[in-house]
Amino acid sequence: MNTDDTITIYDVAREAGVSMATVSRVVNGNKNVKENTRKKVLEVIDRLDYRPNAVARGLASKKTTTVGVVIPNIANAYFSILAKGIDDIATMYKYNIVLASSDEDDDKEVNVINTLFAKQVDGIIFMGHHLTEKIRAEFSRARTPVVLSGTVDLEHQLPSVNIDHSKAAQDAVALLAKHHDKIAFVSGPLIDDINGKVRLAGYKEGLKKKGLPFKEGLVFEAQYKYQEGYQLAQRVINSGATAAYVAEDELAAGLLNGLFAAGKKVPEDFEIITSNDSTIALYTRPNMTSISQPIYDLGAVAMRMLTKIMNKEELEEKEIVLNHGIRERGTTK
């Protein structure tokens, strides 16, 4: 047997008196193994503390007490607060978390999810800006339960926890319309359902309710990055807009500083409402008025929902919508 600290599949196979292929089949849950052989291999895995022993115990109980969490950007303040809510409830119910970042890349997102499935997680919480058809296909093929947190599902297929982003957009427009008739929508990528379908619809409806026309020239698309907001500032000014509803806090912070650089005073010359009320809204000067979301609760409630599904408990609601509001600060009058 190895004399170093690393126990290998070879060590397990030799100790159990079986082939390495048999050990692999046991660890991966292959049913083509005799029951007495399976038990013997699992016993050796436990005794030698072979690295997949947690998985092996999970195969015996059909649970690994591990939950995969897919996050699009681990550095994003909004998603990091969501993840904190998930982790706290997971700890309360004695689940371990495997946090996996997709880096806002669709292909990596698919790979990340398949990796979590391969780890035999008991469930997945998905956070993302949109659900691609590839992701939907992966979720529909798998037996592993999935809950969406802060993610829009227009097809209403998956359990989810969210706020009403359309109504939130309407509320933002209503506040800005008190002093302005040219209100820009500074959006993240419009391919994301939360922007192109939900927030945009709310923005249009908000304008309609205030008797204001919708103009495509007042809709600006950008990535969720500070620099993109900063660079957009002059275009927003040139559009004639004197106020903006912004889809993301980092983007809004960039726009705010870009307006200052262009000689505009906020809120005297230009008003801004952002969307997430993350800590970024408090780091700017002035602090940003924002749609207030119970971000931590979005994660915590999603994790509690997942524990119910994993324990075969009945869900009272498949889609939970939490309350939102507007927290007025220094970027509005």
UniProtKB/Swiss-Prot annotation:
Keyword Lyase among UniProt keywords: no
DNA-binding region, residue intervals: 9-28
Identify the PROSITE patterns for this entry. HTH_LACI_1 (PS00356), HTH_LACI_2 (PS50932)
Q: Which SUPFAM superfamilies does the UniProt entry name for this protein?
A: lambda repressor-like DNA-binding domains (SSF47413), Periplasmic binding protein-like I (SSF53822)
Q: Which residues form the HTH lacI-type domain?
A: 7-61
The organism sits in which domain of life?
Bacteria
UniProt-listed Pfam families: LacI, Peripla_BP_3
Keyword annotations for this protein, in alphabetical order, are: Activator, DNA-binding, Repressor, Transcription, Transcription regulation
Give the Gene3D superfamilies listed for this entry.
3.40.50.2300, lambda repressor-like DNA-binding domains
Provide a Gene Ontology MF annotation, just one: DNA-binding transcription factor activity
Q: Give a short account of what the protein does.
A: Global transcriptional regulator of carbon catabolite repression (CCR) and carbon catabolite activation (CCA), which ensures optimal energy usage under diverse conditions.
Question: What protein name is recorded for this chain?
Answer: Catabolite control protein A
Please report the organism this UniProt entry assigns to the protein: Streptococcus mutans serotype c (strain ATCC 700610 / UA159)
